[in-house]
């Protein structure tokens, strides 16, 4: 229960990986890892695509495929372990929905089994509008970070030309920079990091 450290009491999935670690999914409170008698919890605020975890399947490359009310999402088990060890602060997950061919993003998970691994390695997940079949071998990833493009910039709500470099006087406030990333794969899920220097 939550008194013992579990992320939520409404458990929807329990998966034991090949090392004997238990991964426990909840209705809407995220996922817990149970290892060596201790819980580590993962939520949307930590990088999960959704806090619903109805079923967990693992592919040969070490990725978890998880069904939820927002579709199916994929997360690297190694990243989950690194997060638990404190070596990273955020998990990367990729969501799949109607734009990827699902008829409904609302997966079913109130009963077991909420997923099925076929002999060909594909995963079957029940949804409100039929079955969603995932082939992990057909997953296309983009190993190169997308090119970041600065679209415009303003200082104290006035547009400034930044193309040849810019110096901002001391005391100026409200600096806004609009930027985007260019990618043809899952562009709506690009995550940015930034750092102010100086």
Sequence positions of predicted segments:
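Residue-level "micro-hotspots" composed of small/polar
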Residues: 3-15, 27, 40, 44-198
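Surface-exposed extracellular loop regions of Gram-negative outer-membrane beta-barrel proteins
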Residues: 30-35
